[in-house]
UniProtKB/Swiss-Prot annotation:
The gene is RIB7. NADP(+) binds at residues 79, 83, 164, 187-191. One of its GO terms (biological process) is riboflavin biosynthetic process. The lineage of its organism: Eukaryota, Fungi, Dikarya, Ascomycota, Saccharomycotina. This is 2,5-diamino-6-ribosylamino-4(3H)-pyrimidinone 5'-phosphate reductase. Homodimer. Signal peptide: none annotated. It comes from Kluyveromyces marxianus (Yeast). InterPro entries: DHFR-like_dom_sf, RibD_C, RibDG_C, Riboflavin_Biosynth_HTPR.
Length: 249
């Protein structure tokens, strides 16, 4: 995939919402942004279980610029099993062309409580073996009986409802794997869950594609009202980008 040049005005626009090692050094958890593309009717996919392209070329370049800026990129296993993404980075500064993309790529973190996804069969592994991507950290309820080679596992704690303890998982990522910043890309369940945890999300970067996907699409809509602050908008040729922070209670 050949990327379009990064729009120059995106760099200062995004800067206030990106990680800063000095500012974030004393924090127990990594710096976390929630970033995804949605349609005008708040859908992230046209039909459940299918891959849908919403953003356009200029904001695809922005996505890879963000990947260049973060230590790790997080997705739920459902999205990974549908899309089979590489999750590497294909953007770099003009004067810093890397020999291999692994050196500039974020580390994938896959939320896979029940060990459904297989690294061995994935595009991620092909990129890893070619030196163009990193091997993942897989977040599980318990270690699999046959751990996959090259993979690191993080055994998550659950809260009183049996759901993943987000706070503990993020703290473990920083303390055990030195992950200082994470961009969370999806899917729908993960996005909706984190939107309701403003104390864990440091910034929100949403790409709005110029399309409606219809009522059968996968909707992003938290159960409760969520208010935003520090809101900024960027408008491109076909997409608009919203950057903000979540109001904490």
């Amino acid at each position: 995939m050949v990327l379009l040049p990064l729009k120059k005005d995106l760099v200062p626009f995004l800067e206030p919402y990106l990680p800063d090692e000095e500012r974030d050094a004393d924090k127990e958890k990594p710096y976390v942004i929630l970033t995804y593309a949605q349609s005008l009717d708040s859908r992230i996919a046209k039909i459940k279980g299918t891959r849908t392209f919403i953003s356009h070329e200029e904001t695809k370049t922005m996505t890879h610029y963000l990947r260049y800026k973060f230590d790790a990129i997080m997705l739920g296993c459902g999205t990974v099993m549908i899309d089979d993404p590489g999750l590497n980075c294909k953007w770099w500064p003009e004067d810093e062309k890397p020999e291999h993309l692994a050196g500039i790529s974020p580390r994938p973190i896959i939320l896979d409580p029940n060990c459904k996804w297989k690294f061995a069969d994935s595009k991620m592994k092909k990129l890893y073996e070619a030196g163009d991507g990193k091997a993942p950290i897989i977040v599980v309820k318990e270690l699999p009986s046959e751990p996959e080679e090259g993979v690191d596992y993080l055994v998550m704690r659950t809260n009183f409802t049996g759901k993943m303890d987000w706070s503990d998982m993020l703290v473990q990522l920083k303390s055990k794997f030195n992950v200082k910043s994470v961009m969370v890309e999806g899917g729908g369940i993960v996005i909706n869950d984190l939107l309701q945890r403003p104390n864990l999300v440091d910034a929100l970067i949403i790409t709005l594609g110029a399309t409606f996907l219809g009522s059968e699409g996968v909707e992003v809509s938290p159960l409760v009202e969520i208010k935003l602050k520090d809101v900024s908008w960027w408008t491109g040729d076909l997409d608009t980008v919203l950057c903000s922070r979540l109001v904490t209670h």
